[in-house]
């Protein structure tokens, strides 16, 4: 099938690779290179980098609302467009241009967690399951009818990165199935009940309040790892907490217990991966060798 692929971050790359292996990708659309790193040099998106490695033509318009951009898109003569974490709103002329329309790969069980950060929000909310939906796109934000859906359990110690990687591979597999069965799939309108929105993650959500229950803090750490990274102050230094598990232990909220376990409002969490500023992530034993925490140390955010 002649396809246009539209995506930008790491999450989109396995999908691009799967489509390239099994279909004809006539063009790749992604976000333009942007300044990044200490030197603030323009850095291409992961999708642009991989597409160029595969020898695929790449476009990165800043808007698809101009008549010129829409004419260039339509001239590709694609049977369908596959969209995953692209980053631009698709106006109606773009949605209408491919013969079979535009198919979106969304990392949630729609209509729950429409929007920008469905993987983060599922973990933060304590959802026990999530999944991938293949959706026929329309003008609304993730409102289109669902063609195919697959569920997966969220593990008790899974981070955003863990779930991101699993769902990315699941999306690549599922879109191949959807394209192969497109003539037989029946679009299912999303129900009005159960709609929630996955707002973008704000940095203000990352500071840990140790008076909260351990279960909430556990979800906060896992649901913000690796970015932006839940953080606390230890010995006056900001430390990112990247992996954890619920643990036994009692103490005043924020009290550091043996083995980098920290007491919460109720219960405790054992930190299994932490990162000081300017350092690489470390497991507890190595972390404490270079950053000993005397008895009576407290974690806090202000």
From Swiss-Prot:
It catalyses: L-methionyl-tRNA(fMet) + (6R)-10-formyltetrahydrofolate = N-formyl-L-methionyl-tRNA(fMet) + (6S)-5,6,7,8-tetrahydrofolate + H(+). Its EC number is 2.1.2.9. The keyword Transferase applies. CDD domains: FMT_core_Met-tRNA-FMT_N, Met_tRNA_FMT_C. Keywords: Protein biosynthesis, Transferase. Residues 276-288 have a biased composition (Basic and acidic residues). GO terms for molecular function: methionyl-tRNA formyltransferase activity. Residues 276-302 are annotated as: Disordered. (6S)-5,6,7,8-tetrahydrofolate binds at residues 108-111. Signal peptide: none annotated. One of its GO terms (cellular component) is cytosol. It is an enzyme of class 2 (transferase). InterPro entries: Fmt, Formyl_trans_C, Formyl_transf_N, Formyl_transf_N_sf, Formyl_transferase-like_C_sf, GART_AS, Met-tRNA-FMT_C, Met-tRNA-FMT_N. HAMAP family: Formyl_trans. Belongs to the Fmt family. Attaches a formyl group to the free amino group of methionyl-tRNA(fMet). The formyl group appears to play a dual role in the initiator identity of N-formylmethionyl-tRNA by promoting its recognition by IF2 and preventing the misappropriation of this tRNA by the elongation apparatus. This is Methionyl-tRNA formyltransferase. It comes from Cereibacter sphaeroides (strain ATCC 17029 / ATH 2.4.9).
